[in-house]
Each structure stands twice: as C-alpha cells, then as structure tokens.
C-alpha cells in the first residue's frame, strides 16, 4: 500500500489539477491528450515505484499501490469538481434540474431523442425565464437579453461550441471577432445587391423545375420536405459552385444530401464540447462530419479548377480570388478556412431556407383561408406567375409577414446560438449573469412565450404589419442576428422564399394530403443544431389561368 504521504499527495494533486488548471480557461479541445498524460503519468509512477521497491515487493503489489494512487488522484479531481459545482458555482442561484448542476450530461440524456428544443421548452415552462441546463450553462428566454447577448454591440463572444469541429473551420465558426470581420468583408461581395440581382435568373431555373415537378404530381400526395430539400440544395450548389446535383430534374436523392444530414447528426445530442471532441475524433462516430468536409473539399477543388472560366459569378468567386493572391505558405494555412466556407455556404443556405419553406406551406395548409389571402395580395403585383421579380413583390406585407411568422414559430435553428459572457458578466435588466457563462436564447421557446407575443401559439402574420401591438417585445425577434455576426444571407433568404412561394401559390391550390395533418412535422422534427424536418405530404391542384 502507498504511504499516507503518497495518498495525501495524490488526493491533493487531483484537487489542485481542478482548482489550478481545469477551472480556468477552456480545456475541451484535445481530450485524448489528457488520457495520454494520465496513462503516461501512471506508467511513470509505476516504473518509479518498481525501481524503488522492486527488490522487496512483487509486481502485483506495485501495480496495486499505483492503482490506489491513481484512484485517489481521480477521486480528488472529481470530488473537487462536484463540490465546486454543488456549493460554490455562481450559477447555483439560477433554477433548473438538480442534476444539471453536476453535469451537462443530464441535458444530453434529455436530448437523446434529438429534440432538445422541445425539452428546453418544457424546462422553461417549469423553471421560468432562466434555466440552468449545465454546470456552466444557462438557457435564457428574457426578451431584454436578445440585444445584450446577440445584438450588434454585444460583449458576448462565440462559445467553445463553435470550435468543437476542429480542424474544420469557417467564417461562421471563427471565434476571434476581428478575424471573423476580416473574412466576412472578403465574402461580402457575393451577397451584395448587384450579386443578388445576378443570381435571380439562375434561381428562376430552379423555381421553374420545382413548379414543373409540382405540376407533374398535381392531384397526388407530394412529399414537400423531400422536394423543397432538392430545391434548396440544387439552387445553392449552383450559386455557390456554379454546378448542380440535378435532383429536381431527376427526382433522385444525391448522396450529398444524405452526407449533409449525417454531418450534422452528432450536434443533435447537445454534447459538452469536450465530449463532442471525443466522438469527433473517433472514426465511426465522426464519419458524417468527415464525409461532409470531404464532400465540400471536393466541390471546392473542382470549382477552383474553373476559376476564370465560369459564365456566371458565384459565391466562391471572391473567396477564390482572395486565395489566389496569397503567398504559397499563406495559402497552405488558409485552405482549411476556404474549404470550411464552402461547406458553410452549402449547408446554411440550403437547409435553413428549405426548412422554412416546408413549414410555411404547412401553415398554408393548416390556416384556413391564409393562402387565398396571400394570393390575393400578390396576384395584382405580378404580370407573369412564371417569372416573378422580387422587386415586384417586395412590398407584399402579408407574404413577408408569413415568412416572419414561420420563423417565429418554426425557426430552423430552434435551440439558438451559444455565446460566452465576458469576464465581468452581463446584466439583463436587474439580472446579473456571471462571467464566462455559456448562454443560449432558444428562438423556439421565445416564440412560444405569451409575455413576448400575444396569442403566441397562433399563426397570426398580421402582428408583423397591421397589428404590431401583438408583439410585446420587438427586440425579441432576431432571426438573422445583428451586426457583424448577423446572417450574411438574410436578403437572399427573403428573396428565395418570397419568390418561390408566390410562384407556387399563384399556380396551385394546396392542401394536406389525405391522412396528413402536419403533426409529425411539428412534433417529431429533430434538432441537429439546425432543424431536420420530418416528411410533410400535401396535394397541389392546378388553378385556372388568372393572368392575361
């Protein structure tokens, strides 16, 4: 057995490791290094003890002694962590499940069905606006906090969540604000008004393909989740890479669409960053994210070979132009970021837009008379339903209100964005949130708050124009965030949604397919960081000619 002094040293060493190291800063990036250090330290201790005691004791005794010291060290480390979380953590004054004080794994357990956004809603209904969901994690639905946490002048920064996919990086996951802003300025020309006007005719091609497929299925059940997904992916591949997977034309799912879903799957478990890193570095569990990264890298390589030869500008053009001006060494360093941006543009642009469109048509089917009212508004503004310019429908209030109301009730990133408070903490009204707290403001929960939105569970698009009094806290709605961290594709998203929705409803009536009520879409869609919608089956019926 080890001496009393050795046992005390091991125990104190474990406590000190927590208090002097793990308690300070972020230690999530390389979890396997700690495993390696622990093994190396244990073997070194065993070798040292054998060299000192090997002549008088057995291998088994030395091994047993080393194991006891290892157990005491880990016990001291774990005990210190638990005692701090139970009695000294400044977040202890916030309500929440007791188990959440001890470990974020409790919320992982709650989210094991990949519907974490719905679990957050249940927790907020039970505990209130501020809920502790982990030892250092708060979920907040206080509308006064939106601009403080996510606004243009927020002192909060991106949390470790944005770095858990290393070495895969992108502009969106860049946590250094100055570096993010520099990269965003390079990307900005791809989203300028001039660029968006240039994309219009190319987007129209995919709107036409979608309406053609709707026409071919007219009178029969159609899975709009599938077809709107094809539309989103084909469209974004065209304006990002100057290419398409032709899923709308062929009606067949390209393997890349499955890769995108697989690449996001691990995020759905709401793992703490250190545990995410464990799984992200294991071949089987990380196959989805690695497949997505490889897919984007291949698409980028093909696109780079076409630089200067494409007939139309695309979103990668300014990024590749900037890359080509760099030195060889700088290119080598910046290539992962370029690959990451190509992945970001495809996933963020296709998934979020198509998901919103699916839920918008769910509401067109569910809300009696809604699609007729939108049609009556849009129809006088359009001369040809097969060639709609966004400038013609820009002022269509009800149409755009339907988009906003869909984003309120069915936000494509339902659990929100993870931010880290500054060292001094932040104040939301009279509530002080301690420094270095991981804070999220789930839009799904905020959208269902009666103190924020009157008749919050009802789809009332008029709240966005003719009945503004139904929005009690206007700052609570930030679907595209604000400032330099805002979604750079906001204007493109509104254009895509408004134009394609108008083109469809001007030519077709829409209703739920027999046996469909949309409940599966609403209740069973998965939260994978972004909402992964369940199938929605509707029936489109060709309308009579209404335009000369």
Curated annotation (Swiss-Prot):
Molecular-function GO term, any one: monooxygenase activity
Family of the protein in this entry: Belongs to the cytochrome P450 family.
PANTHER family in the record: CYTOCHROME P450, L-ORNITHINE-N5-MONOOXYGENASE (EUROFUNG)
Gene3D superfamilies in the cross-refs: Cytochrome P450
Key words of the record: Glycoprotein, Heme, Iron, Membrane, Metal-binding, Monooxygenase, Oxidoreductase, Transmembrane, Transmembrane helix
Gene induction: Expression is positively regulated by the leucinostatins biosynthesis cluster-specific transcription regulator lcsF.
Gene Ontology CC: membrane
Alphabetical list of InterPro entries matching this protein: Cyt_P450, Cyt_P450_E_grp-IV, Cyt_P450_sf, Cytochrome_P450_monoxygenase
Coiled coil location: none
Protein name: Cytochrome P450 monooxygenase lcsK
Amino acids binding heme: 487
Glycosylation sites: 172, 223, 242, 404
CDD domains: CYP67-like (cd11061)
Membrane topology: Multi-pass membrane protein
Taxonomic source organism: Purpureocillium lilacinum (Paecilomyces lilacinus)
Top-level taxon of the source organism: Eukaryota
């Amino acid at each position: 057995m080890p001496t009393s002094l050795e046992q005390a040293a091991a125990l104190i060493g474990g406590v000190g490791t927590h208090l002097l190291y793990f308690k300070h800063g972020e230690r999530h990036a390389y979890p396997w290094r700690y495993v390696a250090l622990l093994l190396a330290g244990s073997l070194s201790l065993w070798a040292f003890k054998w060299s000192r005691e090997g002549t008088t004791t057995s291998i088994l005794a030395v091994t047993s002694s080393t194991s006891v010291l290892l157990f005491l060290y880990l016990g001291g480390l774990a005990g210190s962590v638990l005692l701090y979380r139970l009695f000294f953590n400044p977040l202890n004054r916030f309500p929440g499940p007791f188990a959440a004080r001890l470990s974020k794994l409790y919320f992982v357990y709650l989210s094991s069905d990949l519907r974490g956004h719905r679990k957050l809603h249940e927790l907020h209904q039970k505990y209130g606006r501020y809920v502790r969901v982990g030892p250092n994690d708060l979920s907040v639905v206080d509308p006064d906090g939106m601009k403080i946490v996510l606004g243009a002048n927020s002192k909060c920064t991106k949390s470790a969540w944005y770095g858990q996919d290393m070495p895969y990086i992108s502009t969106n996951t860049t946590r250094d604000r100055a570096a993010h802003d520099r990269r965003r300025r390079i990307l900005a020309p791809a989203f300028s008004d001039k660029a968006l006007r240039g994309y219009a005719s190319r987007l129209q091609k995919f709107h036409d393909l979608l309406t053609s497929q709707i026409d071919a299925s007219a009178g029969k059940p159609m899975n709009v989740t599938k077809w709107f997904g094809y539309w989103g992916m084909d469209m974004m591949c065209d304006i990002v890479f100057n290419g398409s997977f032709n899923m709308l034309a062929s009606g067949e799912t390209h393997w890349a669409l499955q890769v995108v879903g697989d690449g996001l799957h691990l995020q759905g478990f709401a793992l703490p960053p250190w545990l995410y890193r464990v799984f992200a570095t294991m071949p089987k569990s990380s196959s989805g994210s690695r497949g997505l990264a490889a897919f984007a890298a291949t698409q980028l390589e093909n696109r780079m070979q076409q630089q200067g030869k494409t007939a139309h500008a695309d979103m990668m053009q300014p990024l590749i132009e900037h890359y080509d001006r760099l030195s060889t060494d700088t290119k080598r360093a910046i290539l992962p970021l370029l690959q990451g941006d190509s992945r970001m543009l495809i996933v963020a642009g296709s998934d979020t837009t198509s998901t919103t469109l699916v839920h918008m048509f769910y509401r067109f089917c569910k809300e009696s008379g809604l699609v007729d009212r939108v049609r009556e508004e849009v129809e006088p503004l359009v001369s040809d339903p097969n060639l709609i310019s966004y400038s013609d429908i820009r002022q269509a209030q009800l149409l755009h209100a339907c988009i906003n109301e869909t984003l309120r009730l069915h936000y494509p990133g339902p659990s929100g964005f993870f931010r880290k408070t500054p060292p001094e903490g932040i104040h939301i009204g009279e509530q002080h949130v301690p420094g270095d707290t991981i804070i999220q403001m789930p839009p799904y929960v905020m959208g269902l708050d009666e103190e924020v939105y009157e008749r919050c569970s009802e789809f009332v698009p008029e709240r966005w124009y003719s009945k503004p009094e139904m929005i009690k806290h206007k700052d609570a709605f930030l679907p595209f965030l604000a400032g330099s961290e805002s979604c750079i594709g906001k204007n493109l998203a509104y254009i895509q949604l408004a134009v394609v929705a108008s083109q469809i409803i001007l030519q077709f009536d829409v209703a739920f397919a027999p046996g469909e009520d949309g409940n599966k879409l609403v209740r069973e869609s998965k939260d994978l960081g972004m909402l992964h919608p369940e199938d929605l089956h509707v029936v489109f019926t060709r309308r009579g000619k209404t335009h000369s």
